[in-house]
């Protein structure tokens, strides 16, 4: 099936999945690789809200139970914002055992294509009360070009 017909060929998830499928090689076209499955689960398990303001873009991601050292925010090539990290399983204390374990553990990742007017030198990230807020400032709009007057000389 050609995913371009669905209109999802220009999304970060599509590009990530396409890259992983190419990297897997032609020997395993019919079976997804462990890396593909791991990364797809990591992206699906990390929902995010993205807001646009007049001067910035704001990414809000739920990160319950994580410390700032467990979260990594990076800008990759081609203006791609990468939010990743790992939720670690709580160590069992002696004499205690889990009856039920429902909280997610493992690696997580989200990639977002930033617009051309995103200022990748002005990014801040704050994690408070289990919510990560990444703010990307916008570049100022380019000033309109003023007409240049060229002096005409008499020959």
Curated annotation (Swiss-Prot):
| InterPro entries in alphabetical order | A-crystallin/Hsp20_dom (IPR002068), HSP20-like_chaperone (IPR008978), Small_HSP (IPR031107)
Principal subcellular localization: cytoplasm
**Do the record's keywords include Cytoplasm?**
yes
Q: Which SUPFAM superfamilies match?
A: HSP20-like chaperones
Q: Can you cite an annotated GO cellular component? A: cytoplasm
SS bond list: none
Q: Which PROSITE patterns match?
A: SHSP (PS01031)
The sHSP domain extends over: 39-155
Location in or out of the cell:
Cytoplasm
Is Chloroplast among this UniProt entry's keywords? Answer: no
Per UniProt, the keywords (alphabetical) are: Cytoplasm, Stress response
What domain of life does the UniProt record list for this protein's source? Eukaryota
Q: Which PANTHER family match?
A: HEAT-SHOCK PROTEIN 20 FAMILY MEMBER
Q: Which family does it belong to?
A: Belongs to the small heat shock protein (HSP20) family.
What name appears for this protein in its UniProt entry? 17.3 kDa class II heat shock protein
* Annotated organism of origin: Solanum peruvianum (Peruvian tomato)
């Amino acid at each position: 099936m050609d995913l371009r017909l669905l209109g999802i060929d220009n999304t970060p998830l599509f590009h990530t999945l396409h890259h992983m499928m190419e990297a897997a090689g032609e020997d395993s076209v019919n079976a997804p690789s462990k890396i593909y499955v791991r990364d797809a689960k990591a992206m699906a398990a990390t929902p995010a809200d993205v807001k646009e303001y007049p001067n910035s873009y704001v990414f809000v991601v739920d990160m319950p139970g994580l410390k700032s050292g467990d979260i990594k925010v990076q800008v990759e090539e081609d203006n791609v914002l990468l939010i990743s990290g790992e939720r670690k399983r709580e160590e069992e204390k002696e004499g205690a055992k889990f009856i039920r374990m429902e909280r997610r553990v493992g690696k997580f990742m989200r990639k977002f294509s930033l617009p051309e007017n995103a200022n990748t030198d002005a990014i801040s990230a704050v994690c408070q009360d289990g919510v990560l807020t990444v703010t990307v400032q916008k570049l100022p709009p380019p000033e309109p070009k003023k007409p240049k007057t060229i002096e005409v000389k008499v020959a």
